[in-house]
Amino acid sequence: LLYADLIGHWQIRNGEALEYTDPAQLDLAELTDLTERYGGSEMIDAVHSGKGISTRNGAETTGGLAELDDYSACEITEATDIKSLFVDRFYFGCEADDATNAWAFNTKNNPFDAEIKTLFGSDVGHFDVQDMAGVLPEAYELVEDEKITNRDFSHFVFENPVRFWGETNPRFFEGTRVAKEAQALLSSPVGAPA
């Protein structure tokens, strides 16, 4: 949801889009004409007196900000740049019992058909877990309920966690039960079948 929201906001708040809301672009003559033709008497009086109307745009009207494009620091020039920055670089830890985990794999709803990288964040240590053995099966309920596929589940509980920890520390899984499988995955290109 955050990913889609970033793109949605970029579309209306990038530097070029902000030009449409720049008070300096306000055509006062046109506003006055339209108000006189279609506005009520209170609106006409307000426009004539300049109440609530400003064509100033600068540091004094923007809290001292010179750059209003919130996305400029990331050098985003088109919406697909957000996918490259967000989807390729971020992982999100998720609890086993959170049904909204399925959204990460719903490429039909995610902009540019993106799959968001989720990490199975085991709930085993949580105070409200009544049975530690039930945490992983609880996560698998997303597959049983047909909200995600077995492939998605593998990404959630294995592939994404292995890439997250193993790409920053290739020895992370040494000595573990999954060392061989983790090494095989880390040796394969991203997106290759596990």
Where are these regions (language model features)?
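Internal, charge-rich low-complexity segments
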Residues: 1-46
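Mid-to-C-terminal alpha-helical segments outside catalytic/metal-binding sites
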Residues: 29-83, 89-91, 95-117, 126-194
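Active-site glycine-centered loops adjacent to acidic/histidine catalytic or metal-binding residues
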Residues: 123
